[in-house]
């Protein structure tokens, strides 16, 4: 319990540091020409078959609010973007969540870009499952396909040349995958116990990751090479059983 509480405090501190730095950079500039967009939606997740667990339900109603605050200045060479996201869900408390998808400041020059804050990074490729999108954690309570991502605090420097773009990343603050709770559907049986996640790394090594990527376009071909060092965003699911082999719970193991 003490380890979990310490982890939560470190994660909160990393978000507060990112927020303070971005706001200081923003307030140093005149505030004009702001763009505000967003959407509000309702969803009814319904199932044909009755659940196996009496704690689950046949349908789940939820509401979504997402906004985007966008501002650019200095002839477009500096950009601020803020994208908060909230879903309020019926029955499943794990699916009710708030996330900052983006809170970022960008400074662009002819041969480089500096991006500081909370961001979503997409390394686009052609496969249906984007296996190389390893910067951001998956938001599994939003969609089981893993396409929705959680915002990730980062420092990202891009070196832009004719022979390609090199992106360097420092990623403070590891985020666990949120999974559907015991009342939610769909979910495995037994449900995944996120409160007792196991880690291969501890301390600073667990919290901070690094990545580098080179990308280039040649005609119709997009080429990319990347390397990631840190705690994997994709956990191995461990099975805990009793003496008879009956499954008791599933536990995420982050390597």
Predicted features by range, described:
Residues 1-13:
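N-terminal secretory signal peptides that target proteins for export/translocation
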Residues 186-255:
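Surface-exposed beta-loop-beta
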Residues 70, 74-184, 219:
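Outer membrane beta-barrel
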Residues 33-49, 80-82:
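Transmembrane beta-strand segments of Gram-negative outer membrane beta-barrel proteins
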Residues 16-28:
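Bacterial N-terminal signal peptides
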Residues 61-67, 100-103, 151-155, 208-212, ...:
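Hydrophobic, lipid-facing positions within transmembrane beta-strands of outer-membrane proteins
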Residues 54-59, 100-101, 132-137, 176, ...:
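Flexible, surface-exposed loop regions and adjacent strand-edge segments
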């Amino acid at each position: 319990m003490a380890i979990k509480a310490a982890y939560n405090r470190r994660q909160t501190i990393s978000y507060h540091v990112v927020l303070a730095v971005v706001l200081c950079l923003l307030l140093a500039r005149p505030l004009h020409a702001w763009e505000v967009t967003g959407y509000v939606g309702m969803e009814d997740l319904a199932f044909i078959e009755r659940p196996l667990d009496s704690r689950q339900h046949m349908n789940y109603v939820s509401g979504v609010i997402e906004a985007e605050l966008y501002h650019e200045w200095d002839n477009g060479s500096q950009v601020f973007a803020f994208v908060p996201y909230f879903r309020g869900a019926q029955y499943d408390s794990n699916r009710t969540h708030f996330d900052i998808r983006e809170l970022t400041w960008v400074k662009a020059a002819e041969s480089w870009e500096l991006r500081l804050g909370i961001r979503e990074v997409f390394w686009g490729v052609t496969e249906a499952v984007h296996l190389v999108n390893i910067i951001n954690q998956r938001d599994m309570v939003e969609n089981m396909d893993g396409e929705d991502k959680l915002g990730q605090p980062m420092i990202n420097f891009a070196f832009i040349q004719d022979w390609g773009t090199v992106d360097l990343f420092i990623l403070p603050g590891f985020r666990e995958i949120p999974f559907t709770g015991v009342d939610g559907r769909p979910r495995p049986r037994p449900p995944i116990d996120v409160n007792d996640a196991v880690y291969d790394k501890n301390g600073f090594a667990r919290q901070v990751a690094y990545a580098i990527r080179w990308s280039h376009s040649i005609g119709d071909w997009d080429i990319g090479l990347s390397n990631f060092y840190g705690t994997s965003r994709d956990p191995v699911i461990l099975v805990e059983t009793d003496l008879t082999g009956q499954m008791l719970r599933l536990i995420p193991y982050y390597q």
